[in-house]
């Protein structure tokens, strides 16, 4: 891990890039009980047009915000509820250029982090639910 110190503000940031390109940043805060995790992706409200198989593909306005909510669905239920039951305070937001998922907690951080990484890495979409919501 690369370490960068910011002495003016008394912070150190550890950074590592995984083989898949995912960048991880850790800001150690040993004096704090509460821990915080944030996962961001470069996909936001302005991302409505793509090239798929060489052809332009338009998606509906609001699709990023819709997907932000759908990402919490898992085959076993809703990740928001699981995180909350596990003592975390989860949330998410969509801006023009990104979508972020995060939580904070004082206990069970590693388990909550696994849950977060699982639902953002393995989306659970069903044809019926997706089609119904997109038509609304």
Give short role names for the model-derived ranges.
Residues 1-79:
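His/Glu-rich zincin catalytic helix
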Residues 27, 32-50, 62, 78-122:
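M16 family metallopeptidases and their MPP-like homologs
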Residues 123-131:
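Short secondary-structure capping/junction motifs at helix and strand boundaries
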Residues 132-136:
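Conserved small/polar residues in nucleotide/adenosyl-binding loops
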């Amino acid at each position: 891990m690369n370490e960068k110190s910011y002495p003016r503000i008394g912070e150190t940031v550890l950074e590592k890039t995984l083989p898949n390109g995912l960048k991880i940043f850790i800001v150690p805060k040993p004096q704090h009980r509460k821990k915080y995790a944030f996962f961001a992706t470069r996909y936001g409200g302005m991302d409505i047009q793509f090239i798929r198989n060489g052809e332009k593909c338009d998606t509906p306005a609001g699709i990023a915000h819709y997907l932000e909510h759908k990402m919490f669905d898992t085959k076993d239920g809703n990740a928001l509820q699981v995180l909350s039951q596990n003592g975390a305070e989860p949330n998410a937001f969509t801006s023009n250029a990104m979508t972020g998922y995060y939580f904070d907690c004082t206990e069970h951080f590693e388990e909550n982090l696994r849950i977060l990484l699982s639902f953002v890495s393995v989306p659970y979409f069903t044809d019926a639910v997706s089609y119904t919501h997109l038509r609304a």
